[in-house]
Amino acid sequence: KHTTAYEIRLSLVGSEMCIRDSPSAGACGGQFTANTMACVSEVMGLALPYSSGAPAPYEDRDKYAYESGKQIMDLIEKNIRPRDIVTRKSLENAATIVAATGGSTNAGLHLPAIAHECGIKFSLDDVVEIFKRTPYIADLKPGGQYVAKDVYEAGGVPIIIKTLFEGGYIHGDCMTVTGKTIEENLKDVEFNENQKVIRPYNKPLSPTGGVVGLKGNLAPDGAIVKVAGLVNTFFEGYARCFDCEEDAFECVSKKGYENGEVKVIRYEGPKGGPGMREMLSTTAALSGQDVGGKVALITDGRFSGGTRGLCVGHVGPEAATGGP
């Protein structure tokens, strides 16, 4: 098959878009899954203060890598292990920062999984309850204007933790890898008023978190949706159902749908997929066709942290186990 001039131009445009969006090494800049879990590692006390947000090309990375190595040796000597740091309270802190930053819906999977590994009961229901009471304060992509580099230059993850702590949303008595508590680590941290990336807790972008949980007849065991940046949080339309993502993507790529539809992708959960892969192709195609606010998507699969538009995921029970 010969490559057409159109395909070459499309490839070049795509390459330029990638360079502009992710101009260097490291994770994508928005508050997607990587940066969400980086914030989580710091607020849980598993990473040194400021270390989780330094952009990949910055020389600060070398300093944090060296200091992290030293701290690991100190923790080994003192017999302090991750399970001594990961507690119910630290997991609540983690859910708080996810909501406050409009983080990835994948945190709804990762946090209960971390808890399970440590023998702690902490379910999606617990995560959702924290989402409900946490203010959304970080104006980060994909729902906002800024990226992780902007957070770091505004003062880093500690200023997010600081204002949340001042508002009573963070447990300050949790132990961290520094050997000190969250509150002790925040002692010399001052909230930077001369930036627009992070709002103080009492002047939020919205009074509740950028990620919310849903329950209903389509999701008796719950579902999750990122609402950060959503203009319209009410949607009603006819359902068009697919039993795998490939079929849904083919429909979208051929524009075989109408605005106002609700696309339902079933059998993409942990058992049905199997593996619960991201519905990235379909959501990206909808976004690329600029219908993110005109078409909704519901699935028992999951999404990329960069998903935009009204996309409800993690529907439980999944279709493969008899879910709706």
What is each of the regions a protein language model found here?
Residues 123-324:
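Feature captures the catalytic cores and cofactor-binding loops of soluble hydro-lyases/lyases
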Residues 4, 33-36, 299:
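Ser/Thr-centric signal marking residues that sit
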Residues 7, 42, 278:
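Acidic-residue sensor for enzyme active/binding pockets
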Residues 5-6, 28, 236, 270:
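Conserved short-loop catalytic and cofactor-binding motifs
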Residues 1-14, 19:
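Single conserved hydrophobic/aromatic residue that forms the stacking wall/gate
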Residues 7, 106, 274:
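Residues that form or flank phosphate/diphosphate-binding pockets in enzymes
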Residues 15-16, 20-213:
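Mobile "lid/hinge" segments at catalytic clefts and subdomain interfaces of large enzymes
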